[in-house]
């Protein structure tokens, strides 16, 4: 299976979660073992030159790709979560969304100097969530090696925003 073959497993759901939004549903891709394996293999191949020490991902769908990619790369996994979900001491970052603000947290001992972290999520839209995740990793003294996504929303400026950080930005498909 090739990267373009994955498109058939991404379902568009119009007007979800709100009117005018097209939600990209990846559950058909997750259900198909060949498509799922191909996605993980292609992501691993794309980032193989980065020499990362861990993969960090934002809940919830980022965990799917982050966890499997960390396993495939043979490195650790770092969860980045919404407030109140992590049991140990945390560092947090407030960031802007299209219509408001949100907060992400990471355990304060999740990474540190000398670590090279790959940030993974399912969709790259504005880049706000990924940049907040990168800011958290940097706050811990670790380096962000790059970013990896399944989908890039071509009508949004997230790729340009993250590219300005001077890190590699990988994605498999533009929708």
UniProtKB/Swiss-Prot annotation:
Q: Matching InterPro entries, A to Z?
A: Ade_phspho_trans, PRibTrfase_dom, PRTase-like, UPRTase/APRTase
Q: Which family does it belong to?
A: Belongs to the purine/pyrimidine phosphoribosyltransferase family.
One GO MF term: adenine binding
Q: What keywords are assigned to this protein?
A: Cytoplasm, Glycosyltransferase, Purine salvage, Transferase
Location in or out of the cell: Cytoplasm
Per the record, the pathway is: Purine metabolism; AMP biosynthesis via salvage pathway; AMP from adenine: step 1/1
Keyword check for Glycosyltransferase, yes or no: yes
Q: Does the keyword Zinc apply?
A: no
Biological role: Catalyzes a salvage reaction resulting in the formation of AMP, that is energically less costly than de novo synthesis.
Q: Which gene encodes it?
A: apt
Protein EC: 2.4.2.7
What is a biological process (GO) this protein takes part in? purine ribonucleoside salvage
Which HAMAP family did the record assign? Aden_phosphoribosyltr (MF_00004)
Task: Fetch the PANTHER family from UniProt.
Answer: ADENINE PHOSPHORIBOSYLTRANSFERASE
What is this protein's name? Adenine phosphoribosyltransferase
Q: Entry's NCBIfam families? A: apt, PRK02304.1-3, PRK02304.1-5
Name the reaction it catalyses: AMP + diphosphate = 5-phospho-alpha-D-ribose 1-diphosphate + adenine
